[in-house]
């Protein structure tokens, strides 16, 4: 892959410049604490930890982002706030006001890298937003099982299927359990202690 379109390269370049900027400040946020960069119109280099993004209207989780990452670019100058960011673990980050970030990106010719980061953000967020609007419990469960199956093996083996689905949807635990039992009975999936260990082709 061309290094100019490699998201990891773009994150590295942008994050290094944010950290070096004299106007950036370092912050540590505890697990469960909100990160107010969207409300404060800021961007941040997430140096360590994991953050989750939630819809304001109902608190549903729409995405999870691991360090290293540049966060906040997709929400700069939002007219109506729709999401908030919360720390899933203790996080450390370098934070910069968006207006200064704009000047920095221009001075250091970082706009192409910023574009790749925003594009990646939209790519991972929009499909997950669609999951929330599935019409039936079966559709919701199946789509989330596919998403879990796409995770790396270590993360998949530690992901609770019920927590994963319930945190992202207004759906009852009993409805999820019913679909899971049906899928297990038909041989489409295999579970072990609430974790997904096998996923076959599901219509």
Where are these predicted regions, by residue range?
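Cyclic-nucleotide recognition modules
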Residues: 62-118
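His/acidic/aromatic-lined binding-pocket segments of jelly-roll/cupin-type domains
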Residues: 26-27, 35-46, 62-63, 85
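Surface loops and adjacent helix of pleckstrin homology
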Residues: 48, 56-58, 76, 96-98, ...
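Structural motif
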Residues: 42, 50, 90-92, 195
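Phosphate-/nucleic-acid-contacting segments
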Residues: 147-203
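Cyclic nucleotide-binding regulatory module and flanking cytosolic helices
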Residues: 1-33, 39, 70-71
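Glycine- and acidic-residue-biased ligand/ion/polar-headgroup-sensing regions
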Residues: 40-59, 67-69
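Polybasic "coupling" helices that flank or enter modular domains
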Residues: 112-170
């Amino acid at each position: 892959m061309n290094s100019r379109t490699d998201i990891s390269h773009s994150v590295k370049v942008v994050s290094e410049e944010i950290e070096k900027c004299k106007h950036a400040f370092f912050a540590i946020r505890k697990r469960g604490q909100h990160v107010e960069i969207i409300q404060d119109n800021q961007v941040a280099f997430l140096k360590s930890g994991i953050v989750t993004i939630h819809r304001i209207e109902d608190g549903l989780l729409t995405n999870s982002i691991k360090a290293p990452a540049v966060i906040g670019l997709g929400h700069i100058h939002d007219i109506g706030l729709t999401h908030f960011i919360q720390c899933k673990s203790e996080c450390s980050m370098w934070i910069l006001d968006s207006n200064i970030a704009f000047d920095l990106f221009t001075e250091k010719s970082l706009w192409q890298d910023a574009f790749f980061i925003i594009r990646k953000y939209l790519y991972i967020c929009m499909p997950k937003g669609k999951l929330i609007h599935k019409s039936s419990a079966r559709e919701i469960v199946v789509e989330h099982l596919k998403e879990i199956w796409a995770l790396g093996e270590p993360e998949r083996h530690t992901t609770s299927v019920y927590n994963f689905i319930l945190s992202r949807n207004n759906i009852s635990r009993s409805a999820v359990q019913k679909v899971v039992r049906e899928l297990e009975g038909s041989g489409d999936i295999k579970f072990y202690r609430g974790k997904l260990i096998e996923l076959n082709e599901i219509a």
